[in-house]
Amino acid sequence: MEKTPATQTQAEPSLDKTYNPKEIEQPLYNHWEKSGYFKPNGDTSRESFCIVIPPPNVTGSLHMGHAFQQTIMDTMIRYQRMQGKNTLWQSGTDHAGIATQMVVERKIAAEEGKTRHDYGREAFIDKIWQWKAESGGTITNQMRRLGNSVDWERERFTMDEGLSNAVKEAFVRLYQENLIYRGKRLVNWDPKLHTAISDLEVENREVKGSMWHLRYPLADGVTTAEGKDYLIVATTRPETMLGDTGVAVNPEDPRYKDLIGKEIILPLINRRIPIIGDEHADMEKGTGCVKITPAHDFNDYEVGKRHALPMINIMTFDGNIRHKAEVFDTHGEISDSYSSDIPAEYQGIERFAARKTIVAEFERLGLLVEIKAHDLTVPYGDRGGVVIEPMLTDQWYVRTAPLAKVAIEAVENGDIQFVPKQYENMYYSWMRDIQDWCISRQLWWGHRIPAWYDTNGNVYVGRSEEEVRRENNLGTDISLNQDEDVLDTWFSSGLWTFSTLGWPEQTDALKTFHPTDVLVSGFDIIFFWIARMIMMTMHFIKDENGKPQVPFKTVYMTGLIRDEEGQKMSKSKGNVIDPLDMVDGISLEELLEKRTGNMMQPQLAEKIRKRTEKQFPAGIETHGTDALRFTLAALASTGRDINWDMKRLQGYRNFCNKLWNASRFVLMNTEGQDCGQHGGEMALSLADRWILAEFNQTVKAYREALDTYRFDMAANILYEFTWNQFCDWYLELSKPAINKGSEAEVRGARHTLIEVLEGLLRLAHPIIPFITETIWQRVKIVKGIEADTIMLQPFPEFAQEKTDELALTDLEWIKEAIIAVRNIRAEMNIAPGKPLEVLLRNADAGAQRRVAENLNFIQAMGRLSSVTLLSTDEEAPISVTKLINGAEVLIPMAGLVDKEAELSRLNKEIEKLDKEIGAIEGKLSNEGFVSRAPEAVVTKERERLANCNTSKEKLLAQKETIAAL
């Protein structure tokens, strides 16, 4: 945009010449925290607003997902705080059982060559607390760097004494209400870490495997419809056949339905097992016969329950074949329905070695029919890295069906709303098919299960051993041992909204801030965390009428931040970007070290190095926290996948610089000047009236966007107003009044400059807090505001009476006319400073009025020597024409353009574009490129092609115009 200089000499503004986030951010945050601005205001007569943070793992460090969600939360908290609400952002960290235990185990192994067993349970747990004291603050310090206005004095940890009491209380009450029980069921077992793990900790990998077709002989001389004395079963896990207790066929399958109720003689073991009819057997798949191993497969477990088949566990917790099998009935009680003998040659061998041995034996006996290549999904533990074994173990469970019923109703009747709404369906699909929840883990670090056993195996549940002895009249002569297991971390985080506010005590905080207002979370933990919080909260917390209370009124689901090519960010891909590296900047060397150092798979390092050098040849520049936050807000669309975009980050850093420089211009023209704050006549120009009306409309649209959780729209509204309307237009439009206006007009322009800037800073503050506070501290002096911080200033409100339709339409028309002139200059290669004469043809009454009322203004802004209205019958010289609303703008070309030179220039430009178009079309017609390149890359190429074609069309049109001169 062309700039007209402000001619008066002004003093240097109090704002530094360049915006330097590094110098501003941390001192400012420390000041905010020390001043107590993050705390609730304590005014309980005011409406409260509370968000609880999804507690990050105490072992963790800040990643893009955290930065994304926390930016959204802080934007909401700052917005509500500025509306005078009693605001609490409750923070804390999760003890992250398995993750933390592994971090400390690795540490003592590396530093001392010891295992946790060398320490023993108590000493090892002390070691973890010691580690937490030293390293556990990393993530909270990083959260401070993001500008999060969290009440740090209320920070909680899921193993704090208060939260531990809440966990015990919840467990005991659920047990007393028969909603917690101990049972033998199938779980995901990690043979390396020796613990049950949740589905979320299971990573399903696609692998090339085999399908073994095995012959199972029929008992008692029975034959199939085809006269065969055997069935063929197909399996991907032949080692589990030692635990088979049935063979399933589809009851509709004509080949086998007459065999239902007959028996098989299981090879290698000679166990007689029944043939059962079950829908689980698919007639179209494999041979239509499925071996059933209820103790080692989740589907088989369900089939076994339906047909009351015994369960035979053939594996140890290490994943080796047992010396003696464990035989249980369908209820998990020890059974003698089958022998527990296992042939000696398989005893004690590792499960995958057993697979080879068993297949070899089938082959020797002539019972191996064929081996087919087969693509299959294999579950791995995401931390232990080994294949997960479905294992029959004694675990503690929560009966979820009665809890889920209430939790489903809360969403159905609108007490809890999901944003975007489509996530409700995901919630319902989980909740309507809910299984009992396994809450015990075989770890040392975590909330130990509050259950004790006597020597006869009787179980007693209570808040402490003292309570158990007292309630059950157990003398000190009776020995009690506490359950060794700890609770799933999701159990304690399921109580998060109310345990952090003091439950089971009926605290003021609980009364004031519960139910909380909004939960911000990723859709990947909708079941593991969100659903469980709803179930637990509604069970334990009731309102004054005894109605179950929801944990939060709204659930705002964020998408997943992926890299620029749409790939998930992961260490093994080497595409993780640390949010703080974008804030502070990082050299290429340091970035490479970060991405390739300590890799689990060092062979990937070279590929990652090349990719990183290509993407960040000079490392990553400093962008500052505000630019990062603005980018994250702008990317917060309603989609599931959000591709990170470094160009947008650079664009929003430029935005911060633009706002800084605009503020310097405003301060230069207002500091120590008469801005009409103390009376004195004020005349507002059309430009002043327009920007005030424009700002008022912006406030309305911006608030609507924030109120409906459209942070992407809010960011765009803020960007558009600040960059385009305020900086590019209004600052230019204000110069004629400032430089040449009357005293009243100068006062009006100054008043408008400071008024709009101060309002804009308050408007932008929730998204970009640091830069807005820094500038506002200077602006408040000009405006005579006494307050200490922008954080507690009132948020701008839309005022119907400030609507000025006439100013909006008049100035939009003038802008359109000036843009038409500027476009002609650019297209015809006319110097920006060259004064032009403009003719207006077919001007309607509105256009004529606007020119008459604002002639000087239009001439100054368009660098025009004259504006002439042509009568309808008047002939115009050869001109370039643009249509605008209610008129045609003509600029006579005589003496302005060197026709031949201009045509030659345009031909060169067109030739260059043709080459580029050819190259892109070549790429896109290459099937190999289109099928192999990431979707985002192909889309970018298609966009480039469309842009090149548009540019070419424009150049051809210009060429035609010039050729006609």
Swiss-Prot record:
According to UniProt, the reaction catalysed is:
tRNA(Val) + L-valine + ATP = L-valyl-tRNA(Val) + AMP + diphosphate
Tell me one GO molecular function of this protein.
aminoacyl-tRNA deacylase activity
Q: Name the Gene Ontology biological process terms.
A: valyl-tRNA aminoacylation
Record's subcellular location: Cytoplasm
Enzyme category, top tier: ligase
KW Cell membrane (keyword) present: no
Q: What is its EC number?
A: 6.1.1.9
Cross-referenced InterPro entries, in alphabetical order?
A: aa-tRNA-synth_I_CS, aa-tRNA-synth_Ia, Anticodon_Ia_Val, M/V/L/I-tRNA-synth_anticd-bd, Rossmann-like_a/b/a_fold, tRNA-bd_arm, tRNAsynth_Ia_anticodon-bd, Val-tRNA_synth_C_sf
Binding residue positions for ATP: K571
The UniProt annotation puts the region (Disordered) at: 1-23
Q: How does it assemble?
A: Monomer.
| Family membership | Belongs to the class-I aminoacyl-tRNA synthetase family. ValS type 1 subfamily.
Q: What is the protein's name according to its record?
A: Valine--tRNA ligase
Q: Which organism is it from?
A: Photorhabdus laumondii subsp. laumondii (strain DSM 15139 / CIP 105565 / TT01) (Photorhabdus luminescens subsp. laumondii)
Q: Which gene encodes it?
A: valS
